């Protein structure tokens, strides 16, 4: 029986790729990629020419069985996403779950994920936190925010630049305008930026300065 490797890839800076990740990808019989075009750039940079197959949220229900069968037959499969660690607000959970159910060994390499550097650099308490990822866009959004109003741990969210100000404004309504927050964007890239302050202050900043790039919001928990 083969093995499934979950391989983190850089969230921005290609220098963040680990030696081990490169080796695993070069040795894999098959690489599952969220977007073969995006991953193709990374693989070309490191001269990795192994077979690659598309595996994303729109097709993973159909591809999982075939992948599991290939691993059972002895192949080594590596799973990557466009950026960061697969399964963290990215495709990956389904194939990992099916491998575990079928007694297949799963190894997740340590490596890049956007929320850890955003949390550590935020200046907010990081000994206890909860990761919420992307909030529901419509159904369930208010319910989710309501459930977090009494949360005392630091909270972490992912958001698109187009919805950032709207989401921060909603946070001010649910958590109070003076709640501390840190918004980190373009992590590890040339224009990386962290904007810290109260929700009121950070909303004002991004109202005047249109946000771009990938966004991580780190929100302080409710104080006693």
Each model region followed by its residue ranges:
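Short active-site oxyanion
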Residues: 25-31, 103-106, 154-155
């Amino acid at each position: 029986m083969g093995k499934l490797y979950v391989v983190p890839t850089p969230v921005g800076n290609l220098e963040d790729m680990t030696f081990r990740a490169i080796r695993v990808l070069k040795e894999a019989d098959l690489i599952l990629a969220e977007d073969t075009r995006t991953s193709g750039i990374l693989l070309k940079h490191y001269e990795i020419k192994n077979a690659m197959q598309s595996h994303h949220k729109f097709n993973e229900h159909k591809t999982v069985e075939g992948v599991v069968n290939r691993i059972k037959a002895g192949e080594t499969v590596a799973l990557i996403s466009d950026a960061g660690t697969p399964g963290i607000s990215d495709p990956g959970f389904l194939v990992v779950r099916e491998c575990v159910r079928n007694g297949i060994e799963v190894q997740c390499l340590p490596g890049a994920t956007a929320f850890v550097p955003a949390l550590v650099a935020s200046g907010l308490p990081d000994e206890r936190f909860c990761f919420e990822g992307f909030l529901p866009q419509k159904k369930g959004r208010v319910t989710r925010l309501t459930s977090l109003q009494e949360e005392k741990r630091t909270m972490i969210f992912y958001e698109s630049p187009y919805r950032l100000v709207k989401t921060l404004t909603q946070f001010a309504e649910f958590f109070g305008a003076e709640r501390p927050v840190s918004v980190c964007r373009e992590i590890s890239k040339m224009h990386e930026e962290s904007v810290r302050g109260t929700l009121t202050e950070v909303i004002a900043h991004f109202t005047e300065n249109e946000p771009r790039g990938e966004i991580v919001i780190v929100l302080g928990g409710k104080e006693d």
